[in-house]
From Swiss-Prot:
Region (Disordered): 127-153
Sequence segments annotated as region (Ripply homology domain): 93-128
Record-given protein name: Protein ripply2.2
One record GO biological process: negative regulation of transcription by RNA polymerase II
Similarity field: Belongs to the ripply family.
Species, as recorded: Xenopus laevis
Motif (WRPW motif): 58-61
Keyword list, A-Z: Developmental protein, Nucleus, Repressor, Transcription, Transcription regulation
Regulation: induction: Part of a negative feedback loop during somitogenesis. Expression is activated by tbx6 together with thy1 and tcf3.
Domain notes: The ripply homology domain is required for transcriptional repression. The WRPW motif is required for binding to tle/groucho proteins and transcriptional repression.
Gene giving rise to this polypeptide: ripply2.2
Amino acid sequence: MDNINTTIDICGAASGLPSPGDSNSKRLRHRKYLPQRWKCEPRGPARTETQRPQTLFWRPWLLKSHKPKTQAHPYARGLRENPQEQKPVEYNHPVRLFWPKSKLLDNTYQEAADLLRNFPVQATISLYNDSESDTDNEEDSSEEEQDSGFESE
């Protein structure tokens, strides 16, 4: 076994095939002459020419996914109006959640935790004026006017 090159990478690395200058290299190039441990056996069913992909490179946007839509969005499992119903609730993005200004500082952390647990969708919280916050704002503005009046004297 003279002139054996163990660094040639064929099917199994370091296969021990003879170097190209060896007289026995032509004989050992064919698979039938290789020892069984050096042979590359196909893994799976044989492919025909028609089954080969048309492109050489993997392009994920060309592949068709066979996964159902619910598997693509794992958070959607908790968004059902009716638990017996199989279809999850659909939301059009961007989602806006309206939060009253009167509840801005009252129990905000607990309510926000409950909100995130029951509504796990990326959304923008938009504050709105409710009846309680309108009266608070009027009182605040009248106090500011009175304070500013005292400062000017």
